[in-house]
């Protein structure tokens, strides 16, 4: 197998980051980065292309499952189920606990299979109304939603968890369950940090408040059917050794959910909408796979391992560090998890780190910098509350603190105590 130098792998990452910052499509940015890095790293054109194709092939099963998950996502978003869940939670907790309600609503939406940026956009109209009534700053409500979304993301059947489960050959539910305790710590920190920001930054004006149509929303219980069915089907493998692949479980959950809401006749339009949400992620992951193909077959792994050995740090630290670094490079939980898992999974297993521990720590680590400005999440979330770039940038340390908290807790559980 052709090996690329560590310098070549670093060049691949730098070129990819530079192009993404220049608003080039992330998929193209990573493809070009992989090509340039491979050539500079000592491989010829044919060898570089072979490494890129090999890396992309390694991620095709995850891509198939992500496309299938579009049915569940489409049903949740288009049927009004996501709005129903949000309305119920915020109404139950009331205005006095508005920040907790927003964090919890976004966490639950993300945990049941809604993309984290879509979850924030879904909750934002309610957040703006609560902010106006309770005199909360935009920074406080946005941090509450983002922190809740990050917490939900590491225990969800979303593309990031699918990528980690596929690479480490684990049941999807195992990766989801591994994120529950770190997510709860992340939620608690989010609430306390958001409370500190109540009077900092700009406030919501009357004209920014959006009135939602709530008359035709499904009930809270029927809204939960789709994700619950999907999770129960996935849970059959660890509980009873009955394997129902996410390729089947996620769309089937969406179908049954649509039936229970009395909206089965709309399933095709829901599926098409969900597919449109998943397609950019699937395409990006193919670019991610190509980049991972170069990095995985480079000397960069050895450089990182030697650095760990010289520092005296334990070998399991490679998992969260790789997740953190790749999320910084890609500004995406999904891409960060996919690259780190594909590049470092075999090394972690050789170092004695279990599959679940490696997947859990990489997954948590990938939430630390997934909100950086060269990714779409930064701009989509800021736009959801009409926040300007300067004010949005000030939230980055708080978002990173939430991701870091979840990473530390995950590392303690799976690295230090080896549960």
From Swiss-Prot:
The chain crosses the membrane at residues 1-21, 24-44, 66-86, 101-121, 174-194, 216-236, 242-262, 280-300, 311-331, 349-369, 396-416. It is found in: Cell membrane. GO terms for molecular function: gluconate transmembrane transporter activity. Disulfide bonds: none annotated. Keywords: Cell membrane, Membrane, Transmembrane, Transmembrane helix, Transport. Its main location: membrane. It is a multi-pass membrane protein. InterPro entries: Glcn_transporter. Pfam families: GntP_permease. One of its GO terms (cellular component) is plasma membrane. Belongs to the CitM (TC 2.A.11) transporter family. PANTHER family: GNT FAMILY GLUCONATE TRANSPORTER, GNTP FAMILY PERMEASE. This is Uncharacterized transporter HI_0092.
